[in-house]
């Protein structure tokens, strides 16, 4: 992994959509993918017909920390990732997975943790985490021209609800939908997932 940056991730989207021949399309961003999607939509306004953002933020955890305690909490997870990512201890995997999907079944939590561990090294995961926590696309939000739907669960343990509200407030004309739930990653058995899909369907049909 040579470059880990917002610009590199935007170029990744460019590469994929060019390869499949998409000229204009709806773009869905989740978690840190929301900031990346915002950056893409601003760089290529003619290509994004609709922007859909779930569980995201404009400012990463390091940038939006209101005090030293909040900053240290965010950095504590970075330390855990760097030191415990490849560890066989179930304690780290349980902590990490339960943050993202507290309503997950035992099987879902274990599969998620194992997938994370196998798909990248501890050092790459750390660099990825540090980069996303330093993202700030606040200045890009007013430049988004695509119709935008922003959704966020109220009890998200990874990205605070207020971060989602801030994201929506900065985008002209964005619709913000507050959802009852706690899973940062939508789960099949979670009732809120059906609501998310319905909101997207209605939004795209307008």
Predicted regions and their residues:
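Flexible "cap/lid" loop of the alpha/beta hydrolase fold
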Residues: 38, 42-43, 48-83
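Conserved alpha/beta-hydrolase catalytic His-Asp/Glu region
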Residues: 86-131, 140
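Active-site loop/oxyanion-hole signature of alpha/beta-hydrolase fold enzymes
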Residues: 1-28
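Catalytic active-site module of serine/aspartate enzymes centered on a nucleophile-bearing elbow/loop
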Residues: 174-206
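Short alpha-helix in the alpha/beta-hydrolase fold that links the catalytic acid
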Residues: 146, 160-169
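Short beta-strand/loop motif that positions the catalytic acidic residue
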Residues: 144, 150-152
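Acidic catalytic loop of the alpha/beta-hydrolase fold
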Residues: 155-159
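Gly/Ala-rich beta-loop-alpha elbow adjacent to hydrolase catalytic centers
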Residues: 29-33, 37
């Amino acid at each position: 992994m040579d470059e880990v940056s917002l610009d590199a991730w935007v170029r990744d989207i460019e590469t994929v959509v060019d390869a499949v021949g998409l000229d204009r399309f709806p773009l869905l961003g989740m978690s840190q993918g929301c900031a990346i999607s915002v950056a893409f939509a601003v760089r290529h306004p003619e290509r994004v017909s609709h922007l859909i953002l779930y569980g995201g933020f404009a400012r990463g955890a390091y940038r939006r920390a209101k005090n030293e305690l909040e900053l240290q909490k965010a950095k504590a997870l970075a330390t855990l990732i760097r030191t415990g990512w490849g560890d066989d201890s179930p304690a780290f995997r349980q902590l990490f997975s339960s943050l993202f999907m507290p309503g997950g079944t035992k099987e879902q939590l274990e599969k998620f943790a194992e997938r994370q561990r196998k798909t990248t090294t501890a050092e790459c995961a750390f660099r990825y985490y540090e980069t996303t926590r330093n993202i700030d696309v606040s200045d890009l939000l007013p430049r988004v021209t695509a119709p935008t739907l922003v959704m966020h669960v109220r009890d998200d343990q990874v990205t605070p609800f207020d971060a989602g509200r801030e994201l929506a407030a900065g985008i002209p004309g964005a619709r913000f939908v507050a959802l009852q739930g706690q899973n940062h990653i939508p789960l099949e058995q979670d009732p809120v997932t059906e609501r998310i899909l319905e909101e997207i369907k209605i939004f795209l049909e307008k």
